[in-house]
Amino acid sequence: MKAMLVHRSKVQDEHGNTVEIKVWRVPATEHTPFGFKYSFVYIAGGERVIGYDNERGKGHHRHVGGEELPYAFKDIPTLTSDFLTEVAAFKRSTYG
């Protein structure tokens, strides 16, 4: 089974920044035991400021500023909520 795109959205927020979410269904393997590959990114001023992904070999992790931190994946709805919550916190701290 090839990776099958199950969700893709790309929108600009009220500040002109980009929120992009992509989720693929993939075979469950050692690297993707939940059967999903994903990439969630918030781009502000042309730079990735927040990102969540499960790149092969790195597992579930998030990017905040220039740091890469582990992420405890539970499921796609929780991942989406965590990402959007972090984006909202960034916008509050940056734009008031």
PLM regions with names:
Residues 58-71:
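Short helix/strand-capping connector loops at secondary-structure junctions
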Residues 68-96:
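Short, compact, well-ordered microdomains
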